[in-house]
Each structure stands twice: as structure tokens, then as C-alpha cells.
Amino acid sequence: MASLLAKDTYLQDLAKKICAQPGPERQRSTWGVRTKGSEAAGAPKKKRKKTQKKSPEQEQKAMDHKTKALGKKPPTSSRPKNPMVSKQEKGLSSLGSPKDSQGTARESVFALDFLRQRLHEKIQLARGQGSTKELSAATLEKRQRRKQERERKKRKRKERQAKQQVAEAEKKEEPVEVTPKMACKELQESGLIFNKVEVTEEEPASKAQRKKEKRQKVKGNLTPLTGRNYRQLLDRLQARQGRLDELRDQDAAKAQELEAKMKWTNLLYKAEGVKIRDDERLLQEALKRKEKRRAQRQRKWEKRSEHVVEKMQQRQDKRRQNLRKKKAARAERRLQKAHKKGRVLPQDLERAGLS
């Protein structure tokens, strides 16, 4: 800080010295104010030749000559008339006097460094960082840890990127050899297979094809008793039992063989996961429950319909009542207006018994 203060005081003294030097005096114009009397009295004067303006190089040389004679620095004006001329003069002066130019260059560099340092300090203060002397040891340690963590992550990211690049290069270098067997397999496989379930892009089957597949699935020419149409299932079961009874009367052995065959077929269906409904008692109970639920829904629907009709009737009655009230109020207003105007109405005569 002491060095900074010394530099600051030095710069301020230098600026004061430069500002205190007198500027170049303006030359007084020798031109006088002409009047009519002077023109008449005096002899005709010769026209002065226009003096050519000196070039910036000549002016600089003249100034250097004067300063060498007087042993002083050339005076600098605070506001140069032409910025381009002043730049040229500065360049010529720097070329003309190497010692002065070296001194001024050093001073300017020193001043720029000092100002730059002050600017950085102000920026740090504005960011809330400030000088590290005022911070505690814990804060400094935390900053150091954060910096190390950032560097570690950066190194890790670079390593990962390098590994990815190496792997990509290896993949590009190693071409995949496609054997004819693999190509044939890819052509033959028309769909995907997920856990022994073949999923192929086929068109939806027609109605006749579906019926054919259903007949093929039937085992032993015995249609399984499945579904939720309990009445139909009960009728089919009763018909099957009736055929068995008739066959038992004719040939008991044949009937027994058919019954065993039906049982085995039902067992095969159950093994495949098909729910067989071949119990007459359970079918009757399920049918009763279904009929009961249907009756309940029917009653609810009828009740709801009645309620809707009642609501509609109530709205209609209320509307008619409101219309009658409005009509009566309108007639009453008309009567009141007539009474105000002094008219005698038939109703008034009836009330008075004069009609």
C-alpha cells in the first residue's frame, strides 16, 4: 500500500507541473482597423504576400530549437485545435527526442499499471470478494476446497470424453462381419419374439377364418361351457344331461364312456385356463343373481324416469302460475292507471250496485 501511495503522489505532482506550465501566447494581429480617413490620407499600401502555412514537421523543429535554446520543455496546450495535427506532433516529438520519449513512455506504462490495479481492486470489491487479508481462515479453506473440486470434476470430464472418443474410434475401426446364415435368419424372421410369444404383423382374420380356428380348438367335438350367458349355459347343460339319460337307457356302457370322455375334455380345458361352468346348481344361483340385478336396475330406471317426469311437471306448473301472476299484475296496473285518470270502469259500477 505504501508503494501505491507513493506512486499516486508522484503522478499527482507530475500532473500539477504539466498543468502549471504556461501555454503558447497568441500572436497579436498587426492588422489595424481601417477607416475612410486613413484610406484617404495614407498612401496605397502594397499587398502582403500570403505566408504559406508551415507543415507540422517544421513547427515541431522550431519548437525543439526554442526549447533547446531556453533549456525548457515545449509548452503543451490544454486543448489542441486539430486532433490530427496534435497526434502528428506527438509522434514527431517522440521521434525527435529519444530520451524524453523513453521517460514519458515509462511514466505512461507505470500510470496504466497503477490504474489497472485500482480498477481490478474496485471490481473485486463490487463482486464482494475484496482482499484476501480481511477473510477468515475458514472462508479461505472453503474457497480452496471448491477450487480443488472444480479442478477434479474438470479432469474427470476430460478423461470421460477421451475414453468415449477412443471407444468410438475402435468401433469405427472394427467392421461387423455379416455371415450369410445371419442374413437368412433376419429375412426369415418376420416379427418379434417376446418370451416365446410371437408378435407378427398379420392382417386381421376374417369371420370365416375365426370360426374355423374356433372349431379346431374344440377338443373331442365338445364345446366348453364358458361365458356369462347363464341361461344359455344352463339350457346347454340340461340338454347334454338329457342326451346322457337317453343314452343310458339304451346303452349304459356307451353312456358311461361318453360321460368319462366329457369329464376328461373339461379337465383339458381347465388345464389351459378356461373356466368351465358345468355345475347346474351354481348356474341357477348365478342366473337368479343376474335376474335380480336386472330387476333392481329396471326399478331404479323406472323410478328415475318418474322423478324426471314429476320435475318437468312441477316446472311447467310453476311457469304457468308465474305467467298468471304476471297477467293479473299487468291488469291491476292498468286499472290503477285508469283510476288515476278518473275513469269509471264496469267493475266499479258492479261494486257500487249501479249496473
From Swiss-Prot:
Its main location: nucleus. Expressed in all tissues tested, including heart, brain, spleen, lung, liver, muscle, kidney and testis. Residues 54-67, 303-320 have a biased composition (Basic and acidic residues). The modification Phosphoserine is found at S136. GO terms for biological process: ribosome assembly; ribosome biogenesis. It is found in: Nucleus, Nucleoplasm. InterPro entries: Rrp14/SURF6_C, SURF6. Citrullinated by PADI4. One of its GO terms (molecular function) is DNA binding. Residues 94-104 have a biased composition (Polar residues). Residues 18-104, 123-178, 198-227, 290-355 are annotated as: Disordered. Transmembrane segments: none annotated. GO terms for cellular component: chromosome; granular component; nucleolus; nucleoplasm. A motif (Nuclear localization signal) lies at residues 45-49, 152-156. The modification Phosphothreonine is found at T223. Residues 44-53, 143-160, 208-218, 290-302 have a biased composition (Basic residues). The modification Citrulline is found at R106. Keywords: Citrullination, DNA-binding, Nucleus, Phosphoprotein, RNA-binding. Binds to both DNA and RNA in vitro, with a stronger binding capacity for RNA. May represent a nucleolar constitutive protein involved in ribosomal biosynthesis or assembly. Belongs to the SURF6 family. PANTHER family: SURFEIT LOCUS PROTEIN 6. This is Surfeit locus protein 6.
